[in-house]
Amino acid sequence: MALNSGSPPAIGPYYENHGYQPENPYPAQPTVVPTVYEVHPAQYYPSPVPQYAPRVLTQASNPVVCTQPKSPSGTVCTSKTKKALCITLTLGTFLVGAALAAGLLWKFMGSKCSNSGIECDSSGTCINPSNWCDGVSHCPGGEDENRCVRLYGPNFILQVYSSQRKSWHPVCQDDWNENYGRAACRDMGYKNNFYSSQGIVDDSGSTSFMKLNTSAGNVDIYKKLYHSDACSSKAVVSLRCIACGVNLNSSRQSRIVGGESALPGAWPWQVSLHVQNVHVCGGSIITPEWIVTAAHCVEKPLNNPWHWTAFAGILRQSFMFYGAGYQVEKVISHPNYDSKTKNNDIALMKLQKPLTFNDLVKPVCLPNPGMMLQPEQLCWISGWGATEEKGKTSEVLNAAKVLLIETQRCNSRYVYDNLITPAMICAGFLQGNVDSCQGDSGGPLVTSKNNIWWLIGDTSWGSGCAKAYRPGVYGNVMVFTDWIYRQMRADG
């Protein structure tokens, strides 16, 4: 976690670290012909450094001045022939630009379906919304029948999709009990032993509900529900599928400013991910079994789970040599991750043995649909990354306060010049001074809402550390929650 831009070291290689990877802890290797970003691992051992291409800004940061001379009349095209040619060229340029924009939009948004269709992830087939959650599988992978339940907003309102209305509706409290709550959480991908509690939220303003049919028999929870315009209790169900987003010392968080050492229990979801006893990346606990990290951390050869050990609840790296780590059983990288652009930079790790939760080890909440992020929203980053550019991994866990930066501003030519996709979030300060850095990759970007901490980003990339107009870039977890739940369901 960098407090400011460090100076280049007096000796050794100096290079722009665009992915926040840690320094290579292995001894120097025989001299080879260098390439700018290539990492040469020690013989017989996998490199603990995530290997990937750096982000390169495509334009200079200074404005480009057009020096084309104009005619005395103030226009370039004077004759009829020239005017016709200019119009043709202008129209052609516009059409080409529109086609490129459409192609980029399709690429980054990742769906080929129109507004009237929903895409099957397994095949790319477009399904009519009326066929989604109708009790019949239309997608080859069956995802149209297992993505019918969700939690909405910061109050965890339980919603179920209605194929009749082609929209999501809250579940009426009438006849509801804990058993149904556990079943709904299980449908999302949580295990029964994760279940926390259910609540009731006054939602008398709603005019459309999903109500329980108690005589429906032993079927999936969404098949027990039917659409109704009335709810006798005038209350809807709120579910906590796991006790998440709670930390210690919440009243003392203002003391952790600008990258200071973290307090015990302040960031209990933070894990240190090691390869061969060396910290490589960070991660965030979302259940006793699942860790969220960055896809660039687990590029080959580090996609093999046996390389990885996770440490939770320990603030100092030196103490991890004496503590028991948790071996990783499975590594799942997002299938659409692009190692060049860092688009869809998210991955999951499943642990061989579940974590035991306590005051120092707790999960962070995944964001729910309906949660809106605001420009300059207060967030926090944490990790064992370097405290200055080109520095070494920190001994202690650090945390720092950052602000969200709106995508339009972050995509300006003076910042990242259209490198930011909908699957990314910018956070930090345009003046620099506070940022993620080498070794922070995969770690959390969190924000507090309703006294609950939410994971809204995973540390992805940047241009150097804490440089002006080069804020940190994070994977947009709000885009990936459906994918995360799908992996949890498939492995449940």
Swiss-Prot record:
Compartment annotation: Cell membrane
Keyword Membrane: yes
Cytoplasmic compartment spans: 1-84
Effect noted on mutating S441A: Loss of activity. No effect on HKU1-CoV viral entry
Outcome, altering W461A: No effect on catalytic activity. Abolishes HKU1-CoV S protein-binding and viral entry
Broad class of the protein's primary localization: membrane
Effect of K340D: No effect on HKU1-CoV viral entry
A GO cellular-component term linked to this record: nucleoplasm
PANTHER family in UniProt: ACROSIN-RELATED, TRANSMEMBRANE SERINE PROTEASE 2
Pfam families associated with the record: SRCR_2 (PF15494), Trypsin (PF00089)
Positions of transmembrane segments: 85-105
Residue intervals of the SRCR domain: 149-242
Protein name stated in the entry: Transmembrane protease serine 2
Tissues where the protein occurs: Expressed in several tissues that comprise large populations of epithelial cells with the highest level of transcripts measured in the prostate gland. Expressed in type II pneumocytes in the lung (at protein level). Expressed strongly in small intestine. Also expressed in colon, stomach and salivary gland. Coexpressed with ACE2 within lung type II pneumocytes, ileal absorptive enterocytes, intestinal epithelial cells, cornea, gallbladder and nasal goblet secretory cells.
Gene3D superfamilies: Low-density Lipoprotein Receptor (4.10.400.10), SRCR-like domain (3.10.250.10), Trypsin-like serine proteases (2.40.10.10)
Effect of L419 to R/A/M: No effect on catalytic activity. Abolishes HKU1-CoV viral entry
HKU1-CoV S protein-binding, as annotated region: 340-470
Residues on Extracellular side: 106-492
Effect noted on mutating Y414 to A/S/L/R: No effect on catalytic activity. Almost abolishes S protein-binding and HKU1-CoV viral entry
Effect of A468P: No effect on HKU1-CoV viral entry
